[in-house]
Curated annotation (Swiss-Prot):
Coiled coil: none annotated. The gene is PCMP-H15. Gene3D superfamilies: Tetratricopeptide repeat domain (1.25.40.10). It holds the Pfam family E_motif. GO terms for biological process: RNA modification. Disulfide bonds: none annotated. PPR repeats lie at residues 30-64, 65-95, 96-130, 133-167, 168-198, 199-233, 234-268, 269-299, 300-334, 335-365, 371-401. Signal peptide: none annotated. Residues 1-28 form a transit peptide. This is Pentatricopeptide repeat-containing protein At5g40410, mitochondrial.
Length: 608
């Protein structure tokens, strides 16, 4: 019977969404039995259909049968019609605890914690005086996660203790999650430690909340502990652990988790393998991403799109286009996310005509209306190609209000081409949209500095100070010995600093003698002398990280560096030179994309 109901539910949804039946004829065709009507209500997607089903219920069966009244209440709430739900609930001849829980659950699903408290109060003072149970409090906690205050959460905690429901592991897990989301890890850990029986969800929750609070390494410690006490990881475990690997940026750790995924029999799980593919890409291992993708049996649209995103982020636009065409060839329908990555790939590779073609194809062939992300990509594509007025024209023609992402793309292009007039317009709009984002002020200041407008640049920097905005400091990260090493500008804090600085001098000497290289001091946007500029630019964090990488990373392995800001022009040229002189492969991920340096060239073709 249960299988039949599930089948019926999916069948009803299919028929209705495909519009094989009109709403009225769809309802008329239903058998007048409780099981069929409950299945139809559960799959209901419109208020019109809900009302027709409500009429069918009134004419055909009684609210007393099969909890159908509860299902209708939940349906009305799910569709945003609170008044109808409340009216129906009040008209129900018999209301048990399930009925009250349905009402609370409906409000919880929409984050209406105040309404949940109101219904809970009514429930307890009603004639019968129902006692809240595990289901009641799970809904309450869920609503609290949406946006409840700490006081409200603690109030629910107190009620749970009062009614003796804190022994239920599901309720405790929900509280562990809620306290973690509020940043109160002490309370989460206390609840976890006090649990007499910790299930896998308990351990998974501890991994996730530590990750969310910037403690990925501590979360992984809970993962290891869960395995030691005999819990086998499931899909949720691996997804959380893979996110932790991304946060920590340790490739060897990711490879170890990959082995556990294979050993645990999850290599056929498309959700996990897609996350693994994405992780390798973000860690600079594009080849590993490709290997994982090609090992997936019948990859779905998410896997195809993830691989497309990998090519885009790494700047391999032509490969991204080939991948997209192959995806379409195999009958996988692209969605708006697919086109965002495809247009991004075109933007990162300077493929203007291709980008225009796919932007047009998206709406004409696939009936996908362009969204803000698509316009951001197109503005970036046109702007970085030097077509600043075309980019600005596209913004003015947009059918919706341009977002900060759109104006940010234009401002970035203005920085490249030193267009102070258009850059000022873009920055002013960004100041309105994102008044607390210091990056926009820094960008405009840099545009003025690059154009020699030192007074204007100083004015913007002073404006930043007045607003209390702080410029983010540049730092670079590199993995070695299962540890992430961090470097900042002019960094001498590392134990191997003397060796690093010696290597840095050696590199500069080779670059000058073998290539006649001169530092690109125009990228130092400070009104100081040339000698000072050269000294400043030679101590950028990514250069220090590259020197360290040359010392410790095996020649058989690429030197992979992460930079929190955009790589500067001189560091970009230096990386190309080092890759040629030292015959090393260098991969740098900055705030925008990956750069693959080999034999004196970069994968971005200097288009970045």
């Amino acid at each position: 019977m249960i299988k039949a109901n599930v089948y019926s539910c999916s069948k009803f949804r299919f028929l209705y969404r495909r519009r094989f039946l009109s709403q009225s004829s769809f309802v008329h065709s239903l058998d007048a039995n409780v099981s069929s009507l409950i299945a139809a209500v559960k799959s209901c997607v419109s208020i019109e259909l809900c009302r027709l089903l409500h009429c069918k219920v009134v004419k055909s069966v009684s609210y007393r049968h099969g909890f159908i009244g509860d299902q209708l209440v939940g349906c009305y709430l799910r569709l945003g019609h609170d008044v109808c739900a409340e009216k129906l609930f009040d008209e129900m001849p018999e209301r048990d605890l399930v009925s009250w829980n349905s009402l609370i659950s409906g409000y919880s699903g929409r984050g209406y914690l105040g309404k949940c408290f109101e219904v809970l109060s009514r429930m307890m003072i009603s004639e019968v005086g129902f006692r809240p149970n595990e289901v009641t409090f799970l809904s309450m906690i869920s609503a609290c996660v949406y946006g409840g205050s700490k006081e409200e959460g603690r109030c629910i905690h107190g009620l749970v203790m009062k009614f003796g429901v804190l022994e239920e592991v599901k309720v405790v897990n929900a509280f562990i999650n809620w306290y973690g989301k509020t940043g109160d890890l002490t309370s989460s850990c206390k609840l976890f430690e006090d649990l007499s029986i910790k299930n896998l969800v308990s351990w998974n929750t501890m991994i996730v909340i530590h990750l969310q609070n910037g403690l990925a390494e501590k979360g992984l410690a809970y993962f290891n502990m869960s395995r030691r006490v005999g819990h086998e990881p499931d899909q949720a475990t691996f997804l959380a652990v893979l996110r932790s690997c991304e946060d920590m940026g340790v490739v060897r750790l990711a490879q170890g988790i990959h082995g556990l995924i294979m050993f645990g029999g999850f290599s056929g799980n498309k959700c996990i393998t897609t996350a693994l593919l994405d992780l390798y890409s973000k860690l600079g291992r594009l080849e590993d991403s490709s290997t994982v993708f090609h090992e997936i049996t019948s990859p779905d649209s998410m896997a195809w799109t993830a691989m497309l995103a990998a090519y885009a982020t790494h700047g391999f636009g032509r490969d991204a286009i080939k991948h997209f065409e192959l995806m379409v060839h195999y009958g996988i329908s692209p969605d708006h996310v697919t086109f965002t990555h495809l247009l991004n790939a075109c933007s990162h590779s300077g493929l203007v005509e291709e980008g225009k073609h796919y932007f047009e194809t998206m709406s004409k062939r696939y009936r996908i209306d362009p969204r803000l992300d698509h316009y951001s990509c197109m503005v970036d594509l046109l702007g970085r190609s030097g077509l600043l007025q075309d980019a600005y024209g596209l913004i003015k023609e947009m059918p919706m209000e341009p977002s900060s992402g759109v104006w940010g793309a234009l401002l970035g292009a203005c920085r490249v081409y030193k267009d102070t007039q258009l850059g000022t317009k873009a920055a002013e709009r960004l100041f309105e949209l994102e008044p607390r984002d210091g990056r926009n002020y820094v960008m405009l200041s840099n545009i003025y500095s690059a154009s020699g407008l030192w007074k204007d640049a100083s004015r913007i920097r002073n404006l930043m100070k007045q607003k209390g905005l702080v410029r983010a400091s540049g730092c670079s990260y590199i993995e070695h010995g299962n540890k992430i090493h961090k470097f900042v500008v002019g960094d001498w804090s590392h134990p191997e600093s003397e060796k690093i600085q010696k290597k840095l001098k050696e590199i500069r000497k080779k670059m000058k003698s073998e290539m006649g290289y001169k530092s690109k001091t125009e990228f130092v946007l400070h009104d100081v002398g040339e000698d000072v500029k050269e000294e400043m630019i030679n101590q950028h964090s990514e250069k220090i990280a590259m020197a360290f990488g040359l010392l410790v990373v095996s020649p058989m392995e690429p030197i992979i560096i992460r930079k929190n800001l955009r790589i500067c022009g001189d560091c970009h040229e230096t990386a190309k030179a080092i890759s040629l002189i030292e015959k090393r492969r260098i991969i740098i991920r900055d705030s925008k994309r990956f750069h693959h340096f080999l034999d004196g060239s970069c994968s971005c073709s200097d288009y970045w």
